[in-house]
Amino acid sequence: YHEKSVISFLIVAAILLVIYMVFGRKLPASKQIYGKEGFVIVGLAWILWSAFGALPFVISGSIPYYIDALFETISGFTTTGSTILADIEALPMGISFWRSFTHWIGGMGVLVFVMMITSLDDENAMPLMRAEVPGPEADKLVPKARHTARLLYGMYFVLTAAEVVFLLFGGMNLYDALLHAFSTT
């Protein structure tokens, strides 16, 4: 849509790439993750994901204060539904897409998403899954954590796509259908 907000996403991507190059390439001595460590990793991941997820709002100028952008991002990732924005439709389209996408990611849990795309082996992924998924579901769905995450997200993709199709048949344009599907799936 030829918006300047794309620059904010490129800046955040560059920041994250630099952080990865400095810290992410060092492998720990032990790859074993225990239950307590799983809870710490989940907590830190939520904090960091939210902290960096707020940056596009601030860098683009859509939300001028970082604390407000952080609130908006945490609200999305936790699917709280609260907002500090008086006029959501006034956001640039790229930022509006990001805001809705945070709700979609939050719908299944950030950590389940991260587990699906990372290379954790199943033995080390299960403590993270137990820390992220409420109730006994983590142990009962499938013993392989990565497989479970892929299965859940497969169903989530299908539900999201179905909602987009129904909204398109209802007369909504593709962009708005995606935003509504991300925010309600």
For every predicted segment, state its role.
Residues 1-185:
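Membrane-proximal intracellular helices of multi-pass ion channels
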